[in-house]
Amino acid sequence: PETLNWIDTFKKNSIFWDIGANIGLYSCYAASRANCQVYAFEPSVFNLELLVKNININSLSEKIKIIPFPLCEKLSFNSFNLSNKEWGGAMSNFGTNKDHENLQDLFKYNFNYNTFGLSIDESVKLLNFPKPNYIKIDVDGIEHLILKSLHTKFLIANLS
């Protein structure tokens, strides 16, 4: 409920980056409720199917862009590790399986594949994505690496 309440405060027609979009609950809510342009970052092949379905069921394909790769600290090609193969599943990460505080394994993974990832700044600079006004990050333990990549002052100044 806290995240939905937060989305209710968004200014109309804002840019919302949903990093770790899963099946698109917050993406769809922001696109329909606040008329946001949404960039839904979701690298799990299992979650992508439901994300696409939810966007189409809600007639939001013009408002939500799907980015099927992970955000990370810097441009890299690495292993995307998943703890399960369930649709709507969680507990996955990119490039590492260690938590940032005590360097313990985050979880046991049983499925992985290699893909590329890039930083928030690189997404704006290299791919011309619009600067976000709002960012939600829910990526099971590598939030610190994604935030570490947020160097550009003009990008930070755009956030609400």
What are these regions (language model features)?
Residues 1-160:
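Phosphate/nucleotide-binding beta-alpha loop and adjacent structural elements of enzyme active sites
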